[in-house]
Design a protein with these regions (language model features):
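A glycine-rich, hydrophobic loop/mini-helix early in the fold
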Residues: 29-73
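C-terminal accessory module of base-excision DNA glycosylases/AP lyases that mediates lesion recognition
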Residues: 1-19, 23, 29, 64, ...
Length: 170
């Protein structure tokens, strides 16, 4: 992992707007340092997981362990908040370098308000999502994705395409 990876990954994490969600749950006097720690840990874990993806040895349990590590290291964040940045980075890495490789079946769909809203039921904030609820949501996503012949990580591709269309890029 070099400076360019870190810079790109930081830009992507910032674009996910996870700081907004973290800002609503972290104490004001600790918010800045904890968000910095979140970004640092997410980038460190991404370095390890992207190397495994590149070697085609990445497993879903590796991702979940990394998410547990991030969540446990930062008081006041939920599993739902911990997952956002890392899952987006893994998704981007897979689409750029490994699209079509079966390793995509190991990846989860990044949860956000749009994805959660598409699953129906009451709207749930990332701050309220614990690991069991996260796993349940990923299984729901898997059911929908299988119907379309896609991996879980591709479930939110529809909104990516909509956004690009709105910007005149598709």
């Amino acid at each position: 992992m070099n400076i360019y990876h870190k810079s790109l990954w930081l830009t992507i994490i910032n674009a996910t707007m996870i700081g907004r969600s973290l800002g609503t749950t972290l104490p004001p006097n600790r918010r800045h340092n904890r968000i910095k720690l979140y970004k640092k840990l997410t980038i460190e874990e991404m370095g390890k997981l992207s190397a495994k993806m590149d070697q085609h040895t990445l497993r879903r349990r590796d991702i979940h362990r990394a998410l547990d590590k991030i969540k446990d290291a930062i008081p006041g964040i939920s599993f739902g908040q911990a997952q956002k940045g890392l899952n987006v980075l893994l998704k981007v890495h897979w689409f750029l370098y490994h699209k079509g490789h079966p390793i995509g079946s190991e990846l989860d769909c990044p949860l956000d308000s749009k994805v959660l809203g598409s699953l129906g039921g009451p709207q749930i904030r990332l701050a309220r999502i614990d690991k069991p609820m996260y796993m349940t949501k990923q299984e729901e996503i898997m059911s929908h994705s299988q119907v379309r012949g896609e991996h879980r990580v591709e479930y939110d591709r529809i909104w990516d395409e909509d956004h690009l269309r709105d910007e005149g890029l598709l």
